[in-house]
């Protein structure tokens, strides 16, 4: 697959602005023309080698950090993607954190508190396997988590979700202004997810 074809394919699945973007308008199973398993493997190997060199520069300069956020449903391939893509980097410069259900200490603080604690230092790459987006996804589906957070009743309601999204956007903008590049990777299709789960069960 030629580089320009890959760039065009990536442009179709890359979101640079949330304005007028809806996941339902994009087929997560779409495969770019000319992409085969062999070309994908070759591109992955090239990308891993390039990432390794970029990581060395990132570490040596010590001014920027990179935060890769993987947020998707179970069986979406987050673990496998992290394992394969990061296989060629120096593990001393990478921290992977998987966010599980919040514990008592985390519930006693604001919802971004546990995220702040895991941010990568300058010169390093941080990877979040699940993230602060859990607070507008899982918490919405499991109100008992929200109840356990002890938020004053006057702050609850529909406005809470809008406020949290604003807080997340502000948090990520702040990180960018402090020299932390935030890269976000979301979603696979439900059909792909069902297929992956059926292979395990």
Predicted regions and their residues:
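Conserved small/polar residues in nucleotide/adenosyl-binding loops
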Residues: 191-201
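Extended hydrophobic secondary-structure segments that form protein cores and membrane-embedded regions
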Residues: 67-72, 184-187
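Charged, amphipathic alpha-helical linker segments immediately N-terminal to NTP-binding catalytic cores
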Residues: 1-48
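Loop/turn-to-beta-strand initiation segments
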Residues: 64-65, 123-125, 179-183
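Glycine-rich phosphate-binding P-loop
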Residues: 69-86
């Amino acid at each position: 697959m030629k580089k320009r074809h890959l760039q065009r394919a990536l442009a179709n699945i890359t979101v640079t602005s949330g304005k007028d973007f809806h996941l339902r308008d994009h087929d997560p199973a779409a495969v770019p023309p000319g992409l085969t398993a062999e070309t994908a493997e070759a591109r992955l190997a090239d990308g891993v080698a390039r990432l390794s060199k970029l990581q060395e520069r990132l570490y040596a300069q010590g001014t920027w950090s990179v935060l890769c956020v993987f947020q998707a449903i179970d069986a979406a391939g987050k673990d496998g993607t992290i394992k394969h893509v990061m296989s060629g980097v120096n593990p001393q410069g990478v921290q992977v954190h998987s966010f599980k259900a919040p514990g008592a200490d985390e519930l006693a603080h604001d919802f971004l508190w546990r995220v702040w604690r895991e941010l990568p230092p300058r010169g390093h790459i941080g990877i979040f396997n699940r993230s602060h987006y859990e607070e507008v996804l899982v918490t919405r589906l499991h109100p008992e988590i929200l109840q356990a957070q002890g938020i004053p009743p006057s702050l609850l309601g529909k406005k809470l979700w809008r406020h949290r999204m604003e807080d997340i956007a502000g948090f990520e903008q702040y990180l960018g202004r402090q020299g932390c590049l935030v890269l976000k990777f979301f979603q696979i299709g439900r059909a792909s997810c069902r297929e992956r789960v059926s292979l395990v069960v």
